[in-house]
Amino acid sequence: MTQDKILILDFGSQVTQLIARRVREAHVYCELHSFDMPLDEIKAFNPKGIILSGGPNSVYESDYQADTGIFDLGIPILGICYGMQFMAHHLGGEVQPGNQREFGYAQVKTIDSELTRGIQDDTPNTLDVWMSHGDKVSKLPTGFTVIGDTPSCPIAMMENAEKQFYGIQFHPEVTHTKQGRALLNRFVLDICGAQPGWTMPNYIEEAVAKIREQVGSDEVILGLSGGVDSSVAAALIHRAIGDQLTCVFVDHGLLRLNEGKMVMDMFARNLGVKVIHVDAEGQFMAKLAGVTDPEKKRKIIGAEFIEVFDAEEKKLTNAKWLAQGTIYPDVIESAGAKTKKAHAIKSHHNVGGLPENMKLKLLEPLRDLFKDEVRELGVALGLPREMVYRHPFPGPGLGVRILGEVKKEYADLLRQADDIFIQELRNTTDENGTSWYDLTSQAFAVFLPVKSVGVMGDGRTYDYVVALRAVITSDFMTAHWAELPYSLLGRVSNRIINEVKGINRVVYDVSGKPPATIEWE
């Protein structure tokens, strides 16, 4: 690869991948590697600059140290949160526990510097930022000056202008920091001098070559769910190896309404991809009977998928690889980032739900891409825009949208309710004519295994409850609940209650992420 590159050393922050996303938004190629990446590998990577991520640990813990030789490479370095503390500690400054943790919004007063010049928010020389730290730099290393402070953090930003070393105690990668993108662009484009040459067509060329090299003449099986991730993965792999790819479409009884027909029409008939359609509803439902724990459900669904693939593998002479549409947010939510130092939230079906004795090797061509990049890739590969920009759908399907035990009755009710919700979102527009489906990033219905009392006509009902969930997000790492019009919510509720026999109450989820996750399980 001849284009300019930025290296991100990951110390285990839950939002480290957002740094990579922001850098790529500037069309500069970057890679995220573990903080303990050997110095000779860093030199071989030949980055234009290095970004040190945040992390949950202390600089005084010996297990969380990068090679300090990075400070002798003669290239710009930006330390974020823990990365700033690591920089200060190893260059002769001091880091101490703060008297109080600083978490959330803060206003930083800035001093003119190469990093901050011309970047400000509503008032001169101030930045509205997002803090999340306990320790802080208490004494500057030699050669550094303060370029930003808050009342509780006198050294919130620091620089060594001569060496082009910068430290910031807040997180520019999250959307809560208003000028975060501008600060990162200043570092990457201006200070590091990286040229913006990374695009999806370039990525396709590199990814295709990598898949061909990795797979060789082996055959590959991919579980095609109809979701964006698996669909784009299928198109990319098919571009690379053609008929060596066989997609297995598993109907586990937990798909959206008419999902099976849509998938077969698109891939088998229109794109010429080999697709095996497996009806495994009975197998999955039997295994899930009586199981209420969401982690167990995820692992059961993952294990059953492998059983299905094993059965199909026996029919394919050279099948060696299982392809998946795993993307960055899947990995970070499972604490599966390359450092494995992030604090775990929950397992993901593409990461933690696979049995250790899986017989196939894993092929994950989208593992380093964010959702918006996956969509951009899908369009570049020629997939229909309406498919590529379809809302995300989890691999376990409705299995993680039915709280508690999964039953066919529940799945049938939820399918109908969810379809009504999506129909109304597509058919309702804002004042600019944009549908609420396009205005929201993800929307779906959740089945609650509780009954409530209702009245229909002259009779009393005692039926189930569904919750509606709609969020707006740029990265799926954080999300805000969508403020849907009351009239839209009213129509959805009326239709579900009147058209879906067995549901008599509809509620709307107004939780953000954090503290909630987007999916309920």
UniProtKB/Swiss-Prot annotation:
Q: Name the domain of life this protein comes from.
A: Bacteria
What region holds the GMPS ATP-PPase domain? 198-390
What EC number(s) is this enzyme filed under?
Answer: 6.3.5.2
* Pfam families per record: GATase, GMP_synt_C, NAD_synthase
**Record: active site:** C81, H171, E173
Q: Which PROSITE patterns match?
A: GATASE_TYPE_1, GMPS_ATP_PPASE
Entry-linked CDD domains? GATase1_GMP_Synthase, GMP_synthase_C
Occurrences of domain Glutamine amidotransferase type-1 (ranges): 5-197
GO CC list: cytosol
- Tell me the route in metabolism or biology where this protein functions: Purine metabolism; GMP biosynthesis; GMP from XMP (L-Gln route): step 1/1
**Gene Ontology terms, MF aspect:** ATP binding; GMP synthase activity
Q: Where does ATP bind?
A: S225, G226, G227, V228, D229, S230, S231
Q: Which InterPro entries would you find in this protein's record?
A: Class_I_gatase-like (IPR029062), GATASE (IPR017926), GMP_synth_C (IPR001674), GMP_synth_GATase (IPR004739), GMP_synthase (IPR022955), GMPS_ATP_PPase_dom (IPR025777), NAD/GMP_synthase (IPR022310), Rossmann-like_a/b/a_fold (IPR014729)
What SUPFAM superfamilies is this protein classified in? Adenine nucleotide alpha hydrolases-like, Class I glutamine amidotransferase-like, GMP synthetase C-terminal dimerisation domain
Record's keyword terms, sorted: ATP-binding, Glutamine amidotransferase, GMP biosynthesis, Ligase, Nucleotide-binding, Purine biosynthesis
Give the stretches traversing the membrane: none
On subunit structure and binding partners, the annotation says: Homodimer.
Role summary: Catalyzes the synthesis of GMP from XMP.
Name of protein: GMP synthase [glutamine-hydrolyzing]
Species of the source? Neisseria meningitidis serogroup A / serotype 4A (strain DSM 15465 / Z2491)
Q: What is the lineage of its organism?
A: Bacteria, Pseudomonadati, Pseudomonadota, Betaproteobacteria, Neisseriales
